[in-house]
């Protein structure tokens, strides 16, 4: 491992120490919570900063794994128009990433969804089977 890779790994570990990044891929529906800082000037001339969180939910159509510059592209339909937004995976602006549902696709990049709408743009859902815990045996009274 060279110096640059080590430096990137240290920075990534610092950036994700207080947030969990789930394992997701193209075709999955994610909900990304982004921190937005609004600046407003009050009447007396003072600048006021307000923070709020905004959720963006859509289908991941591309994921780019490149160390600290990793990113993913999320597409959603808003008021009949397709909207795409690229998020940097390790950015401090990204507050949380939640996987809403897992999709079944056979491609790594789903750019073909840009030309599709309605039923043809649907993605099958992958059902995650979670192993059930075995029931504890209850001792019978004799």
Swiss-Prot record:
Keywords from the UniProt entry: Ribonucleoprotein, Ribosomal protein
Disulfide bonds: none
Domain of life: Bacteria
The keyword RNA-binding appears for this protein: no
One Gene Ontology MF term: structural constituent of ribosome
Any one biological process term the GO annotation gives: translation
PROSITE patterns assigned to the protein according to its UniProt record, in alphabetical order: RIBOSOMAL_L19 (PS01015)
Keyword Ribosomal protein: yes
Function recorded in the entry: This protein is located at the 30S-50S ribosomal subunit interface and may play a role in the structure and function of the aminoacyl-tRNA binding site.
Protein name: Large ribosomal subunit protein bL19
Organism: Rickettsia bellii (strain OSU 85-389)
């Amino acid at each position: 491992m060279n110096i640059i890779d080590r430096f990137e790994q240290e920075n990534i570990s610092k950036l994700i120490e207080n947030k969990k990044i789930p394992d997701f891929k193209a075709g999955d529906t994610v909900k990304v919570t982004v921190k937005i800082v609004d600046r407003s000037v009050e009447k007396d001339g003072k600048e006021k900063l307000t923070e709020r969180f905004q959720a963006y939910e859509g289908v991941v159509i591309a994921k780019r794994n490149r160390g600290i510059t990793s990113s993913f592209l999320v597409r959603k339909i808003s008021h009949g128009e397709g909207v795409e937004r690229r998020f940097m995976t390790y950015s401090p602006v990204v507050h949380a990433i939640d996987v809403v549902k897992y999709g079944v696709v056979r491609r790594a990049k789903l750019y073909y969804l840009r030309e599709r709408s309605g039923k043809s743009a649907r993605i099958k859902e992958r059902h995650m089977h979670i192993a059930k815990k075995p029931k504890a045996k209850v001792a019978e009274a004799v």
